[in-house]
């Protein structure tokens, strides 16, 4: 509907355009049964190469995200004695560095998820802000948006610091700032995130997410 010619490559599994009646993990090999094609890991890495730019964008999640859009899926706390051990980088380093842009979607919004600095950078955002990403030798692009249960956030063009793009209906500016571990940039009164249309909801409920997985993740 929004992107009729979209190609979906199912993460580390390498499945292209799997057609399922319910959502599975991107690494679940059940996806291969309905996929148009499949790529092994070496071919996946070749497609991510910045000279090819096969991937227009990636959609990722994380344990932590910081004010410059760096993400962490590895550990929470000291790497030697972590409080939480995550799934690892699972290709995120390559996608954040070499896809044209990426989007971060989180199922929670609190100070443990929105950190001044992530405990471990496994996906490079705007690093220390400003032009630090380009100075590190990474191609331009990086994080475009962060979406949480409280709002939508983008990055100020010069400083590359996270700012409020919109707040979800019923969410106050104070509420989102209190739930964030750093000061979010804000210009004026943030607009309210638009409600999905009836057509969009119908598509989600009858084609994309028949079993209501998203409703359980985002109550």
Residue ranges of model-derived segments:
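Acidic/aromatic/glycine-rich contiguous surface patches that form carbohydrate-binding/processing clefts
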Residues: 189-219
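Feature targets compositionally biased, intrinsically disordered low-complexity regions
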Residues: 10-13, 122-124, 211
């Amino acid at each position: 509907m929004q992107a009729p010619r979209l190609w979906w490559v199912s993460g580390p599994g390498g499945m292209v355009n799997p057609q399922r009646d319910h959502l599975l993990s991107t690494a679940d090999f059940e996806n291969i049964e309905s996929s148009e094609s499949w790529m092994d890991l070496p071919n996946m890495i070749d497609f991510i190469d910045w000279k090819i730019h096969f991937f227009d964008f990636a959609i990722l999640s994380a344990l932590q995200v910081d004010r410059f859009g760096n993400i962490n899926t590895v550990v929470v706390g000291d790497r030697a004695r972590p409080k939480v051990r995550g799934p690892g980088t699972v290709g995120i380093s390559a996608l954040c560095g070499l896809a044209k842009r990426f989007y971060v979607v989180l199922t929670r919004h609190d100070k443990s998820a929105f950190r001044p600095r992530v405990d471990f950078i496994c996906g490079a955002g705007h690093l220390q802000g400003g032009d630090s990403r380009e100075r590190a030798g990474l191609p331009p692009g990086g994080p475009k948006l962060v979406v949480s249960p409280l709002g939508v956030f983008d990055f100020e063009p010069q400083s590359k610091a996270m700012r409020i793009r919109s707040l979800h209906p019923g969410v106050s500016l104070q509420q989102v700032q209190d739930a964030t571990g750093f000061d979010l940039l804000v210009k004026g009164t943030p607009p309210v995130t638009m409600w999905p249309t009836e057509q969009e909801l119908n598509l989600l409920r009858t084609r994309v997410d028949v079993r209501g997985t998203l409703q359980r993740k985002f109550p």
